[in-house]
């Protein structure tokens, strides 16, 4: 292949190599199947752009990247496909053009922005729409006042045009973005989305506004009396603010929870209303007021008076005239008004309980990530003792295949591209974008000095020159001789670190460091979980203490039951009959009773043995007919007393008393 060939010729040559190895799809397929590939290189013999071969590591025919391009020599077939050389990540062919966002991704973002607003941007947008709708409603009200009709009508006309265009466009965009969800895909899915109540309201508002603008004459809104009835449709725009219906769901949940109390109070209040109104009608149906007119001429008038009274409005158009009617009305007011006021208190307490429940739910939701982090860190601490390779794979950076362009003066890219590339690398290594608490660091190691790469990397050369400024600051040989030691220290400090790409490259100090980091992360997660578990209200503290007290009492009862089962009941309050029954059991009390019985029997036998030994001693000393009392008297007269004669009956003799023969008084003298 000619080194000065044009890019089309080079492309045809690449296609030829691809056909030799198999069918290909794009440059990526060729890179996987061909043992070497061609890259763009500037600064050729003609000053134009040529294609330079990039061969795998160790392949023959590889030249330095900045040298003139040479003809490629195919690598041996047994080497197989290998990743190409990474020259400069700033000029990757994937970053030369903007990444194309998928259609479903754009639909999802638009749908979340319009239908699921979160964040300050969504808040600003929807709040601005609410203000515009409110201003339009105010001008619609002012257009009915003769004093402001001229100003409000003209302004309202142009505001209606803007709002119709805006809401119509937004309706179409909402209908289009709903396709990101599976149940709204296709025509039937869009129709299902359009059948939602809030979508029907939006469509009615847009159509009603278009009818008002089209039928109006001389540029004035609501010019004819036939269109005045459509004005109330403008109020439906206020429903546009709460598209999710959170307000109505909250009200419905409160009413549903307290439905029994509400039904009871309303039922009793309604009964009090109809009975009291009927009694007032009977008392006031013939009464005439000062103007000579009967105020309670029908039962409907009495019901109207009752409704106005129990709702504490009191228009004063109907007033009882007789004392009987006034008495009935006073009793009715005290009784019925209290029942009609109860629903307000019930709903208020229900809303307060609902808010408290949501706060507790939020407080509980904060514990979920903390608990998950604690479980994760605890498991990682446990897995660190396992020598399996999967434990350490998260710390190994996968070798990313980079496709680069050769350029003598590459332009630095924006930081956005760097962030996107970093995000892609993290995603390839199994990291989720939301994992911000415990980031897994990638481990680097010093490359061995005796290992030399088979290729020349411009990126490594540029980084080494950039990170070693002392090589560029050398002025005289004398400076080199006097500062050789300092230069060696600088070069040692500027050693390039290579990322670890395989588990086998991890050493013992790497694993020990990982274990220490995991243990520190475990303690941090434990502390955060304990902080998240702290109660935020006094009621929660009381509830927690009561629950703990209940658990403590249950454990104490269980311990007492086990003690009674093992030791037995206290013998102080047990009668003898129950003790005899308990002797056959295996409790500690029964065993102690049996041991005490055995000790008593042994004591009795030892007493018998002691008496027998005394008799033997007496036989050895003075004969069988010697009396102890006479021996005591005789011994007392001689001035010596034999101590063996005063041994207690329940005491045992010593070993010397049993073995050493006693000497008489004559022998002792």
UniProtKB/Swiss-Prot annotation:
Residues 1-120, 177-192, 243-260, 349-669 are cytoplasmic. It comes from the Eukaryota. GO terms for molecular function: calmodulin binding; delayed rectifier potassium channel activity; identical protein binding; outward rectifier potassium channel activity; phosphatidylinositol-4,5-bisphosphate binding; potassium channel activity; protein kinase A catalytic subunit binding; protein kinase A regulatory subunit binding. Keywords: Calmodulin-binding, Cell membrane, Coiled coil, Cytoplasmic vesicle, Endoplasmic reticulum, Endosome, Glycoprotein, Ion channel, Ion transport, Membrane, Phosphoprotein, Potassium, Potassium channel, Potassium transport, Transmembrane, Transmembrane helix, Transport, Ubl conjugation, Voltage-gated channel. Residues 143-153, 219-226, 284-299, 321-322 are extracellular. One of its GO terms (biological process) is regulation of ventricular cardiac muscle cell membrane repolarization. It catalyses: K(+)(in) = K(+)(out). A 1,2-diacyl-sn-glycero-3-phospho-(1D-myo-inositol-4,5-bisphosphate) binds at residue 244. The modification Phosphoserine is found at residues 27, 407, 409. Residues 300-320 dip into the membrane without crossing it. Glycans are attached at residue 289. Residues 238-246 are annotated as: Interaction with KCNE3. Residues 370-382, 515-529 are annotated as: Interaction with CALM. Residues 535-572 are annotated as: Interaction with KCNE1 C-terminus. The chain crosses the membrane at residues 121-142, 154-176, 193-218, 227-242, 261-283, 323-348. InterPro entries: Ion_trans_dom, K_chnl_volt-dep_KCNQ, K_chnl_volt-dep_KCNQ_C, K_chnl_volt-dep_KCQN1, Volt_channel_dom_sf. It is found in: Cell membrane; Cytoplasmic vesicle membrane; Early endosome; Membrane raft. Phosphorylation at Ser-27 by PKA; increases delayed rectifier potassium channel activity of the KCNQ1-KCNE1 complex through a macromolecular complex that includes PKA, PP1, and the targeting protein AKAP9. Ubiquitinated by NEDD4L; promotes internalization. The ubiquitinylated form is internalized through a clathrin-mediated endocytosis by interacting with AP2M1 and is recycled back to the cell membrane via RAB4A and RAB11A. PIP2 molecule is essential to activate KCNQ channels by inducing the coupling of the voltage-sensing domain (VSD) and the pore-forming domain (PD). Upon channel activation, PIP2 disrupts the VSD-calmodulin/CALM interactions, causing the release of CALM from the VSD which triggers the opening of the gate. Calcium potentiates KCNQ1 channel current through calcium-bound CALM. Calcium-bound CALM competes with PIP2 to stabilize the channel open state. Pfam families: Ion_trans (PF00520), KCNQ_channel (PF03520). It is a multi-pass membrane protein. PANTHER family: POTASSIUM VOLTAGE-GATED CHANNEL SUBFAMILY KQT MEMBER 1, POTASSIUM VOLTAGE-GATED CHANNEL SUBFAMILY KQT MEMBER 4. Pore-forming subunit of the voltage-gated potassium (Kv) channel involved in the regulation of cardiomyocyte excitability and important in normal development and functions of myocardium, inner ear, stomach and colon. Associates with KCNE beta subunits that modulates current kinetics. Induces a voltage-dependent by rapidly activating and slowly deactivating potassium-selective outward current. Also promotes a delayed voltage activated potassium current showing outward rectification characteristic. Each channel subunit contains six transmembrane segments (S1-S6) with S1-S4 forming one voltage sensing domain (VSD) and S5-S6 contributing to form one quarter of an interlocking pore-forming domain (PD). Belongs to the potassium channel family. KQT (TC 1.A.1.15) subfamily. Kv7.1/KCNQ1 sub-subfamily. This is Potassium voltage-gated channel subfamily KQT member 1. It comes from Rattus norvegicus (Rat).
